Regions:
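Acyl-donor-binding surface of acyltransferase catalytic domains
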Residues: 1-12, 156-162
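Short amphipathic alpha-helix that is part of the acyltransferase structural core
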Residues: 5-40, 68
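A conserved beta-strand-loop-helix scaffold within acyl/acetyltransferase catalytic domains
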Residues: 36-98
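A short, internal acetyl-CoA/4′-phosphopantetheine-binding micro-motif in the GNAT/acyltransferase core
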Residues: 98-105, 135
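Conserved acetyl-CoA pyrophosphate-binding loop and the N-cap/start of the following alpha-helix
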Residues: 104, 108-116
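Conserved GNAT acetyl-CoA-binding A-motif
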Residues: 121-134
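Conserved beta-strand-loop-alpha-helix junction that forms the acyl-donor binding cleft
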Residues: 131-142, 158-163
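Conserved acetyl-CoA-binding loop of GNAT-fold acetyltransferases
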Residues: 145-155
Length: 163
């Protein structure tokens, strides 16, 4: 069984993905990419690329309303890769991106985003929820996934050579 949603307090909410959150979520993603990985910011076009399997009904934002304007504290983008289900032997929702800004890392925002997506996937008949996390990820998200019951079912190595 899935864990219940954590209490985030009265000023933090987990909200369904909506086009109004695209730009604030992109800004949050760019802050994370720069601070965590030293990557240049994504353009709107780059942010939208590769979303052929995007499932907005399984995607969420964490919104902090402690100030005079709502701020995105975190986001989760999920997908449905239906072409993989026969090979997997089950129906799976997939968490493609999860980001929580550093000011909210010590809260349960990551847990709440993941659980919101898992509950939505379960409601839609998915058997499992999956994700991929790089071994170099130092944000502590591996412990969050572990605490929610995710288990390593496979590993991938990427190889490259300059040509």
């Amino acid at each position: 069984d899935l864990a219940p949603m954590p209490d985030l307090g009265s000023y933090m909410s987990i909200e369904a993905w909506d086009p109004q959150w695209e730009e604030p979520a992109l800004r949050a993603a760019n802050r994370l990419n720069e601070s965590e990985w030293g990557r240049p910011p994504l353009t709107q076009e780059q942010w939208m690329q590769g979303r052929t399997a995007f499932a907005p009904e399984w995607s969420f934002v964490a919104v902090d309303r402690t100030g005079d304007r709502p701020r995105v504290a975190g986001f989760l983008l999920a997908s449905r890769y239906e072409q993989d289900w026969a090979a997997l032997g089950w129906c799976e929702g997939y968490i493609d991106q999860l980001g929580v800004l550093s000011a909210w890392r010590e809260t349960r925002v990551a847990d709440a985003l993941i659980l919101a997506s898992m509950w939505a996937q379960k409601r839609d008949g998915m058997d499992r929820s999956g994700t991929g996390v790089g071994s170099a990820n130092h944000t502590g998200v591996l412990a969050v996934y572990d605490s929610l019951g995710f288990r390593t079912v496979g590993q991938t190595r990427l190889y490259a050579i300059e040509v």
